[in-house]
Curated annotation (Swiss-Prot):
Assigned GO CC terms: ribonucleoprotein complex; ribosome
NCBIfam families in alphabetical order: PRK05738.2-4
Protein name: Large ribosomal subunit protein uL23
Keyword Cell cycle included in the entry's annotation: no
Keywords: Ribonucleoprotein, Ribosomal protein, RNA-binding, rRNA-binding
Amino acid sequence: MNLYEVLRRPLISEKNSVQAVQNKYVFEIAKGANKRMVKLAVEQAFNVTVEDVNMLHIPGKQKRMGRNLVQTAGLRKAIITLKEGDKITLFEGV
């Protein structure tokens, strides 16, 4: 898997903005990515030093469309902790 396919998009919310003050940033990642791949992708894309990577899987939900039940897509997130002094400028000013 290409390292630029690992990181899908940054997830920006109120909770994630509070975590950014503690040098923790949240990204949506590819389903097949592991911690090593996420660490390499963040370090190469943003030129920072990653201390820790926590990953979680959010399963899809069942929704109704008329009489039919439809399964929404699941989501995989990574919470990335950076070394003190490093920042990802993508999250600043949000």
